[in-house]
Amino acid sequence: PGKTHMQQKQQTIAKTAQLSGRGLFTGQEVSVTFHPAPADYGIVFARKDLNGAEVPARIDNVVQQDRRTMLQQGEATVMTTEHVLSALSGLSIDNCVIEIDATELPGGDGSAKIFTDVIQEAGITTSEAPRRQLIINTPVSVSDGDAVVAAVPHDKPSLQVVYELDYDEHNAIGHQLHVFDFAHGDYASQVAPARTFVLEAEVRQLRAAGIGKHLTPKDILVINHDGPMGGNNYRFDDEPVRHKILDLIGDLYLLGVPIQGRIVAYKSGHALNHELCRALLKQYREQRRNQ
């Protein structure tokens, strides 16, 4: 079917790349080094401070945590992986070793931009190995209360994400709907810069629980009834829903392969995203068996 946007061969970064920062939840200083990896290696985190203990970015390694995605293999844990995985998925990187010297990835400004910037600067190389992918041919959906996320077939050879965010009317976020399609959208400029957001009321609860005491408006978007606080402005009119798309793309990359299909989400968060990912892994394994 002609040339499609879906990259047909596996890719990795062209050279080693580095960045550092502080964890969003822990506030710990952390250095990150991205290393090129061979075909079929996948995305693997390596804890430099734990003798290089590896944690593959796979749904089987997810440990349930509030408000973030956490992975564990053996003694090694890696926290807040969704933004870096979203950047790798968004830029079609199949294989990469992400070396870190603390448990949590850097938060940057709360978006995936620090990661897309460093990956694009390093450059991308293509191998001869064909890229495996999951083509959604059977609809699958998971829900929890009124929150739902579904994967359905798509008429284009690409991934499309439709997200509907619905906060109460009295909230500055309100109701937002955004559609991003890799067939004609540009992930690095349209999704990656969208920042993590919290409501002012939630910040008080988090601080009371001892979380995020170090955070300032440079680290995260705090929204009250008037909109962003602390001198921040929205980067997009619908920045909150775009960030939800960013998280969803990152969580779904725990499948280990790119998806061709449409993902439709309403009020979905990490736990539900992971549940969909598990259902898709089942579908992917069945497809591979029948090939």
Positions of predicted regions on the chain:
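C-terminal regulatory domains involved in ligand/effector binding and gene-expression control
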Residues: 2-94, 99-291
